[in-house]
From Swiss-Prot:
Residues annotated for Zn(2+) 3 binding in this entry: 44, 49, 65, 71
Binding site for Zn(2+) 2: 31, 34, 54, 61
Gene expressing this chain: usp33
Keywords recorded for this protein, A-Z: Cytoplasm, Cytoskeleton, Endocytosis, Hydrolase, Metal-binding, Protease, Repeat, Thiol protease, Ubl conjugation pathway, Zinc, Zinc-finger
Domain writeup: The UBP-type zinc finger binds 3 zinc ions. However, it does not bind ubiquitin, probably because the conserved Arg in position 55 is replaced by a Glu residue.
Stretches with biased composition (Low complexity): 398-411, 875-884
Protein's UniProt keywords contain Acetylation: no
Subcellular location: Cytoplasm, Perinuclear region; Cytoplasm, Cytoskeleton, Microtubule organizing center, Centrosome
Organism: Danio rerio
Chain positions of all zinc fingers (UBP-type): 7-110
Identification of the protein by name: Ubiquitin carboxyl-terminal hydrolase 33
Length: 897
């Protein structure tokens, strides 16, 4: 095709003859300089030039070629859009590529990607957005091509660099979790952080090396190991460590570095979030549980209200049957249902008085504001923070576990109930919620309920978990668990007898007799049933009821409210006493496919997929004091099992895996419907129907569509700001964040999953740019003024008064003015460093405080407010001043004499 449209680009006359077949053939080629393949290859359109080069996503050899040869026109072989380097704009050619290839022409109806006030500039310029690439069937097709067995990716070993088998086994197990690995391989634009030691970049490099096509025999994970040691000193040195503790430390740090703000829906009628600085309830259970901060990771993006369950939930099962016809109890049932459903909004810890007539109002912050006629209904809000990595072995791990709570009937599995008064002052600083690929893949929710058997008051706790630490039941415990399946009352009360429903009396008796001769046969289902079993709180473990104000007998159970995409199960094989440690060597049999979690779900759970297949398992050989870690992993490409023993990678049979002494297991949701959906979308891509609109979709969500059993609603918020534009800080690499798909594919995905918002036009948000400039100006002014005032304070020899300020608040303010934190710190809070003595507020001894001048205090207080004022006097007092004057007077008198 020669010539061309009525375009004002004078360089179109230089276009040579080119056919549709030639463009298609070039699109399957590679860059002539760096040999990288597509997509995003650019072909030179100069007459007689056949050059094909890579774009900005690689070395941008197409631009280099244009600069060296002065060939101005180039065409993107993926989108077939034409760019003129001389005119610095997109131009259009009149071409006839056939009816099935009209997708590129449809781009004519779509405005080029540009800012609202300017044309598209030269690719790569700071003020422009490079046109994102169009998606192909390869971008969404999960059908892996058949590879040569000797060249299968993902079979690279890890070198042991000094007792690091615990790390190598954990890394190989994580590496074979497709949702996480594909994120680091395909969503590189999101792997950015300014936090040290940038562990996410080291992990991304490691994953790239492990799954490279030209794989090496092994990789040395030095950079990642150095980063872990910088995060947690426990891993320094060359002593053997716990593999599960390493996993928690690694995933916590990855979450911190990759977390992004969850956009808050604008709701003018939202309830005011309550203060979340709770006092601890006086429970008889030990305070040894901390939940992870990933409550902020709730990624429900649909706009529908909470689903009303058809069946009653587990909390209702605890109530006396004779009261179910009572009108007050019916109101309370509705309240408890709402409290259960609040789990999708965050981690909550609530006490419900079963005689109150309260109605919960769920705020956008995940808190619940109760309105009722009774004053003894209290709501508990969990103060949930992601735990720091453990500093010891199993004994400490149980206290820092992100697993759900249990009572002391199973060791080291108790909950902490924290409460606040009904109405508390509102916090000025917004409590932001965050999510990351870690929280999206591994976070689930547990609902735990405790009922007082005297007043029927129910305490409901919703907490997020990242892994579940399961006890290994002994012989007597197994007998109780198996026999409970034949006691209907216990099943109704919330026990997990459903897990053993198919077992009859004869099978139970035979298995029980067999266990006396050959030892108990423990299954993973037994461990789960033991964890979720109902517990009676009595004797030394009575429940402290807030309504009765006494220790009462109670009943406690927990269920799963929402299931994670990948379920991480930790078997508690190690017991650490004061003087010695032991290891439980009991073999726990586990399924390779079809782990069913349905018996452990809450009745009103919205989980659609409850079946899991095994991905990988970490095993420990040896004793509690010494041993060796290996991992068995299923390769996603050929579905075969391999043993990863440091540098050695060996194919093994399924029976070998099932006989392993499992320590940590990774299970992934299994859903055949998702595979069918992917194939359907692939066929829609291949149809290449003409469309007038092109849609931009988040690469991160497309990765979830490819690897998750339940990808959830479409979410484009990872590349959009609250105003619907591109945040200025993401404009430079927008091509790494989005993919352009045709209208027919978007229509199908949107009708199937919902979500959004729909995006047909990309532009840099000027509103965000103005806000950033204002914020930077404020930061600079505050920082400069503080430096000047503090310098004057340092030069002052004897200040009359010195003001104290909480270092906790000061660090938050410092993070804000240095650009590390987005939001201002809120009002000054000196309550933790102040103590009231005889009506006077003074500095608390040993308080974490700093000293500033009166001028500095007034400056900060005028901007942020808060208090109280805490001052200290300098050591030179008025008394000492009077004494010095007396001495001078005596000296004068002496001289006179």
């Amino acid at each position: 095709m020669s010539g061309v449209s009525s375009n004002d680009c004078p360089h179109l006359e230089c276009v040579g003859e080119i056919t549709k077949e030639e463009l298609i053939q070039k699109s399957h080629g590679q860059c002539q300089d760096c040999k990288v393949g597509g997509p995003n290859l650019w072909a030179c359109l100069e007459n007689g030039c056949s050059y094909v080069g890579c774009g900005e996503s690689h070395a941008d050899h197409s631009t280099v070629h244009s600069q060296e040869t002065r060939h101005n026109l180039t065409v993107n072989l993926t989108t077939l859009r034409v760019w003129c380097y001389a005119c610095t704009k997109e131009v259009f050619l009149e071409r006839k590529l056939g009816p099935h290839k009209q997708l590129p022409n449809a781009a004519k109806a779509v405005s080029p990607v540009q800012t609202p006030c300017q044309d598209l500039n030269t690719p790569g310029s700071p003020t422009s957005l490079r046109v994102p690439s169009a998606g192909t069937c390869d971008d969404l097709d999960m059908e892996t091509e058949e590879e040569d067995e000797l060249r299968t990716r993902g079979l690279t070993g890890l070198k042991n660099i000094g007792n690091t088998c615990y790390m190598n086994a954990a890394l190989q197990a994580l590496s074979n979790c497709p949702p996480l690995t594909q994120f680091f391989l395909e969503c590189g634009g999101l792997v950015k952080t300014d936090k040290k030691p940038a562990l996410c970049k080291s992990y991304q490099k490691l994953i790239t090396d492990l799954w490279h096509k030209n794989r090496n025999a092994y990789v040395v994970p030095t950079n990642l190991f150095q980063g872990i040691k910088a995060v947690n000193p426990m891993f320094r040195g060359y002593s053997q460590q716990d593999s599960q503790e390493f996993l928690r430390c690694l995933m916590d740090q990855l979450h911190e570095e990759l977390k992004e703000l969850i956009p808050e829906p604008e709701d003018p009628n939202q309830a005011v979030a309550m203060d979340d600085s709770p006092d601890e309830d006086n429970h008889s259970q030990s305070d040894d549980f901390q939940s992870c901060e990933s409550c902020g990771s709730s990624d429900r993006a649909d706009n529908e209200g909470p689903r009303v369950p058809e069946d009653i939930n587990e909390a209702e099962m605890l109530m006396p049957e004779q009261n179910q016809n009572n009108r007050d109890w019916q109101k309370e049932k509705n309240l408890i249902n709402n409290l259960y459903r609040a789990g999708s909004h965050g981690d909550l810890d609530k006490d419900v008085d079963t005689t109150s007539d309260s109605r919960p109002i769920i705020s956008s912050q995940g808190a619940i504001k109760a309105q009722g006629r009774t004053s003894d209904s209290e709501i508990q809000v969990s103060s949930t923070v992601r735990p720091q990595s453990p500093t010891g072995n199993e004994g400490i791990t149980s206290r820092l576990s992100s697993s759900p709570p249990k009572s002391s009937a199973w060791p080291n599995l108790s909950s902490t109930h924290k409460k606040v008064p009904m109405f508390t002052p509102t916090k000025t600083k917004r409590q932001r919620k965050y999510h990351s690929i870690i929280s999206e893949v591994f976070d689930g929710t547990i609902v735990s309920s405790v009922q007082c058997l005297t007043c029927d008051r129910v305490s409901v706790t919703l907490e997020n978990f990242q892994d579940i630490s399961l006890p290994i039941p002994g012989k007597e415990d197994l007998a109780k668990l198996h026999s409970s399946s034949h006691q209907t009352a216990l099943v109704k009360a919330g026990s997990c007898g459903e897990a053993y429903a198919p077992q009859g009396w004869i099978a139970f008796v035979m298995e029980y007799i067999k266990s006396w001769f050959w030892g108990p046969v423990v299954t993973l289902q037994d461990c789960l049933a033991a964890f979720f079993a109902r517990d009676e709180l009595k004797g030394d473990n009575m429940y402290s009821c807030e309504k009765c104000k006494k220790l009462r007998n109670g009943v406690k159970f927990c269920k799963v409210q929402s299931l994670p995409e990948i379920l991480c199960i930790h078997l508690k094989r190690f017991r650490h006493e004061l003087m010695f440690s032991t290891k439980i060597g009991t073999h726990v049999s586990f399924p390779l496919e079809g782990l069913e979690m349905q018996p452990f779900l809450a009745k009103d759970s919205s989980a659609l997929t409850t079946t899991y297949d095994l991905l990988s398992v970490i095993c420990h050989h040896g004793t509690a004091s010494s041993g060796h870690y290996i991992a068995y992993c299923r390769n996603e490409l050929n579905q075969l099992w391999y043993e990863f023993d440091d540098q050695s990678v060996t194919e093994v049979s399924e029976s070998c895996v099932q006989n392993a002494e499992a320590y940590v297991l990774f299970y992934k949701k299994s859903n055949d419907e998702t595979q069918k959906e992917r194939r359907k979308v692939t066929s829609l891509f291949n149809m290449m129907e003409p469309s007038l609109l092109q849609f931009y979709v988040s690469r991160q969500w497309l990765n979830k569509f490819k690897t998750f059993a339940e990808p959830g609603p479409i979410s484009n918020h990872d590349f959009l700001c609250a105003h619907g534009g591109i945040p200025p800080n993401k404009a430079a690499y927008i091509d790494d964040l989005v993919l352009m798909i045709p209208q027919n594919v978007w229509d199908h995905l949107y009708s199937r999953y919902g979500g959004g918002p729909a995006v047909n036009h990309l532009y840099v948000c000027h509103t965000c740019q103005n806000e950033i400039e204002k914020l930077e100006k404020r930061r600079k002014n505050e920082l400069d003024m503080f430096v000047r005032l503090n310098k004057a304070f340092q030069e002052e020899e004897s200040p009359v008064v010195i003001y104290c300020i909480s270092m906790q608040w000061f660090r938050e303010w410092e993070s804000f003015v240095k650009g590390k934190d987005i939001d201002p710190p809120g009002p000054i809070d000196n309550s933790k460093i102040a103590v009231n003595k005889n009506g006077h507020i003074t500095l608390k001894p040993g308080a974490d405080s700093g000293q500033i001048s009166e001028e500095t205090w007034n400056f900060l207080h005028n901007i942020h407010g808060g208090g109280p004022v805490v001052t200290v006097r300098p050591s030179v007092s008025h008394q000492e001043s009077e004494t010095s004057q007396s001495e001078e007077k005596i000296e004068v008198e002496t001289r006179t004499v």
